[in-house]
Amino acid sequence: MGPGFQDAYHAFHTAQDERQLFRQIASVVRQLGFDYCCYGIRVPLPVSKPAVAIFDTYPAGWMEHYQASGFLEIDPTVRTGASSSDLIIWPVSIRDEAARLWSDARDFGLNIGVARSSWTAHGAFGLLTLARRADPLTAAELEQLSATTNWLANLAHALMSPFLMPKLVPESSAALTAREREVLCWTGEGKTAYEIGQILRISERTVNFHVNNVLLKLAATNKVQAVVKAIAIGLI
């Protein structure tokens, strides 16, 4: 019988930083009967190459090989998790586009695994993976994992995000005023400063004042980038 939500909840809240929290997550994963675990988070910025942070207890050398081989770009669990929050089960067959990934993983002792994704309001995508060397998954275990990994992945992501988002996306901590959000929203609709002033019944100069404040808060070089950043991290 694995750990319950309340036990994990209280244990996780004792963590002072992301590394302590991950150790607590790994402990719960071991209690669930898995040798290894991995938590990864991908944030929406920079748009051209979203920042990623990964924590794992995998066998030595696997993550270095994984990253050097570019497996992140073709990993089916990442692709599936990005569009579905269902339990992801590692394939028994390795005859797919990621055949080398699965083959190499097995060479490192990563034979059996499941994964579960979750999201936060700031657009951060999290993926929790549980893996082990042997013992195929049974129908009863999968039924249990379907429920357990749901709360575990969401709890882990919800508590990891406050530690990691300010480091990976400093803009996520920006506090925009109601007026700044209004100005940004209308800017996103393609309105000029003059038109926004007419809509909000404020001067064009005041509109530009709010725009400049937003640019500073979001570390943006222009209005377009400010709108993109604000939408990506859920500020508007």
UniProtKB/Swiss-Prot annotation:
UniProt-listed GO biological process terms: quorum sensing; regulation of DNA-templated transcription
Domain of life: Bacteria
InterPro entries: Sig_transdc_resp-reg_C-effctor, TF_LuxR_autoind-bd_dom, TF_LuxR_autoind-bd_dom_sf, Tscrpt_reg_LuxR_C, WH-like_DNA-bd_sf
Family matches, as Pfam families: Autoind_bind, GerE
UniProt DNA-binding region: 193-212
Keywords on record: Activator, Autoinducer synthesis, DNA-binding, Quorum sensing, Transcription, Transcription regulation
Domain HTH luxR-type: 169-234
Recorded GO MF terms: DNA binding
Matching PANTHER family: DNA-BINDING TRANSCRIPTIONAL ACTIVATOR DEVR_DOSR, HTH LUXR-TYPE DOMAIN-CONTAINING PROTEIN
Family named by the database record: Belongs to the autoinducer-regulated transcriptional regulatory protein family.
Protein name: Transcriptional activator protein SolR
Organism encoding this protein: Ralstonia nicotianae (strain ATCC BAA-1114 / GMI1000) (Ralstonia solanacearum)
